[in-house]
């Protein structure tokens, strides 16, 4: 039976183990299957991502190829359009020649009107000269005023800088002094704390002495009880002697306690004086004129603790006198003492009530005289004197309040300093903006003057062309032919240069982009900022205009002086006009004008052809520049 039971148990154990093994196998298989499925899902997700990336890259490549083909087509179209434009330009030249032939007749008619206008313009020219001189005088005055204002602003700025530096140095000195005072106050506080600890240790010793005295008195009471009744005279003398010695000891203890209490009160008064000194320093920083304000507070703080000390001494003496006599006397003496105390109590109560009334009157007077005394804990009268721990807590609270007030004052001072700095910066910005506006106004006036002078120079050039004779015609024809040849050569050179410049521009753009990306990774240069580019270009253009203005003014002055000489020569070159009659003069002038008009017709045609050629050339350059810009943009997009 035993073997059968063992075999059954073993079978069950084996079966359980087999079941566990099978369960573990199933769990392991399930875990493997789960991990494999997760790995398959991750692999499928990665494969999908790579497929999508591959498809997107292929789509981008297709877009790039299509864009390239479009660009090539657009280039071909632009070339064809350029050829058509050249052909149209040739046709336009022929049409222009025909219109020039028609315009000759109109020019002859206009020439007669120009003679009348010429005289009008001479009078206007003289008026404009006067205005120009006046404007030059005003410009000089404005320049002098600007230099004066600039020098004044500079001096004011330097003075403000000096004042601020002085204020900064003064503030640093005041901060240094305050820190030193804070260190001294901390040292004093530590000394007071050490004194308080010493006083506490002494008080504990006095308490132990009191306990010892009480024990001694309790031990002496049974000895007194055993004394016989017949010897009442002798034992009464001994207790009185012992009582005297004990009273001497207690008076010594009381004196020591009073001394300790005086030390505590002095430490509290010193702390209060330090707090008052801190308040004075803070108020002196903000309001240096109010130096005499905290004096009554300090006097009240120093006078009131003396009264408190006297009251406290009286209370201690009364309490200790009551405690000393009770345990040492007999029952009969205790009864007598109680009766005496009951007799004295109403007198003491009356005295205490009188003292309380006097204290209340003093409080009302102090409240009316000094408002700040309510904050100090030493100024509050109490029927019971506060302990040193409570006074220390109140002093800590006062110190915390004073620290908070100092922090608030510092914050206010910082805010005021920041506001002043902001106002100073705003003023400087306004002054700078005003200077810039004055400069812009001056530049605008100079540009207006330059335009007026240019118009005057054009009118004077017309007069100069009228005065010039036949000698300049062959020179002008040669120059026109030379310029045409140069324009054709330059056009061919420009085409080649544009192609080379396009390639260089692409390389430079690629390099500049790489440099910009690197610079942007490190830090942004304000010169590369797109918001500042327009301003920089505007400033560069203004500088170029300022540099070119003196040259233009000199040329215009020369042109203004030159027509007067030419007019003088023209008048001096015709002596017959002065001698002949008025009719002959008019006839000769008409004949000369006809001859000049006939001679000037080819010159006018040549000049018009030049102007049109130049305009067409400029248009072609602008079109080429626009096409190059479009190409660069497209390449940049690629």
Curated annotation (Swiss-Prot):
It is a single-pass type II membrane protein. Residues 301-316, 323-332, 402-414, 455-467, 510-521, 594-615 have a biased composition (Basic and acidic residues). One of its GO terms (cellular component) is endosome membrane. This is Golgi integral membrane protein 4. Residues 34-638 are lumenal. Residues 348-361, 534-553, 577-593, 616-626 have a biased composition (Acidic residues). It is found in: Golgi apparatus, Golgi stack membrane; Endosome membrane. It comes from Xenopus tropicalis.
